[in-house]
Amino acid sequence: YDIQGIRILLAEDNALNAEIAKTLLEDAGAVLTVVADGRQAVESFVAAPESFDVIILDLMMPVMGGLAAAKKIRGLDFSIAKDIPIVAMTANAFKEDVQQCLEAGMNAHVAKPFDMAKLRQVLCQLVRSDGNAE
């Protein structure tokens, strides 16, 4: 699964998790912008919506969590906000958590600690095909 050149906005409050994800994704050729909470993710997206191909949101973050950030992005009044793929990245992998992610407008869910192959597959499916990943 080739993620070369995919532009990712990653919101993750845990500095170590953010660094690991950034390193692994950049090593695979992705271009990353990392922020520490959902509000920063929304602000970064609003400031430059054309700069990202996909948004990855941790669900549990201070200031604004991933679900609230996804809802806020989906509620923005420009078309790319409705279409940009949003991926939840969380340790909560229960069925109801996944359902909450989908209801918030997210396209996919990746459990932490994440499996790099699975994350690359999800990113490719979402960005290269503009569809929902399983």
Name each model feature, range by range.
Residues Y1-E134:
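C-terminal compact regulatory domains
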